[in-house]
A protein has these predicted regions:
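C-terminal membrane-cytosol helix-exit motif in multi-pass small-molecule transporters
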Residues: 1-16
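Helix-to-loop junctions at the C-terminal end of transmembrane segments
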Residues: 95-106
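Paired intracellular helix-loop junctions of major facilitator superfamily
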Residues: 158-167
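Single conserved hydrophobic/aromatic residue that forms the stacking wall/gate
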Residues: 193-201
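Juxtamembrane intracellular "pre-TM" segments in multi-pass secondary transporters
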Residues: 13-43
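C-terminal transmembrane helical hairpin of 12-TM major facilitator-type secondary transporters
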Residues: 109-153
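A late C-terminal transmembrane helix in Major Facilitator Superfamily
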Residues: 166-191
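Extracytoplasmic gate region of multi-pass secondary transporters
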Residues: 41-84
Length: 201
């Protein structure tokens, strides 16, 4: 809230006070969002996006430690912490650049291309683990950029596809489904890590 107060200018959007009209009207508004065939693909896509992102974030630290042990190369805690911090920082710029690139273009097509590139990026990243530690770290970094590139574009697509009257409901559903995907991503990756291998006795 503090950045909004500091940087939004002297006047924030002012709307007339509307009396609370009951939970059923809110549910109806959310139901109407489900029927919005233009906005829902972006909302569902955001759920898939956060599923992949939070799954990625949950295994990155353990993955770097594992790679360090596998290649018998010592990586200090400070190096790993700074590496992860840089990953998080560059993700912000990746999302902004991706959103800016979609302006005035065929947004669904571009987001589809972004997802396809990210898919191939994940495969290349996995193969890099067998080649070299530092090459693997490089592709982990690149893969992060590819994951987050469509984040702002998906949110913008949700905002643009609908009327101003139900914008709040669209964004609420966007966040709920998005973070539901994020809540599932980490535990599922953890389950895959801890599940017994076929080679285990």
């Amino acid at each position: 809230g503090i950045p909004i107060i500091l940087f939004s200018g002297p006047r924030i959007e002012i709307k007339p006070y509307i009396k609370f009209s009951g939970i059923f009207k809110i549910l109806k508004s959310i139901y109407n969002v489900f029927k919005n065939k233009k906005a829902m693909p972006y909302i569902i896509g955001y759920g898939g996006h956060t599923y992949e992102l939070f799954g990625y974030r949950s295994w990155t630290f353990a993955c770097v430690v594992f790679l360090s042990s596998t290649y018998n190369v010592y990586l200090s805690n400070i190096f790993i912490a700074n590496f992860l911090a840089i990953i998080g920082l560059t993700g912000i710029f990746s999302s902004i650049i991706g959103a800016q690139y979609c302006i005035g273009k065929n947004r669904p097509l571009i987001i589809s291309y972004m997802g396809l590139i990210c898919f191939f990026g994940s495969i290349i990243t996995a193969f890099s683990f067998w080649i070299n530690l530092y090459l693997a770290l490089l592709f982990i970094f690149i893969y992060n950029i590819l994951i987050i590139m469509d984040s702002g574009s998906l949110t913008t697509g949700t905002v643009l596809n609908g009327s101003s009257q139900d914008r709040g409901s669209r964004l609420a559903l966007h966040s709920i489904i998005g973070f539901l995907g994020g809540a599932l991503g980490g535990p599922i990756v953890c389950l895959l890590y801890t599940s017994p291998s076929p080679r285990d006795p």
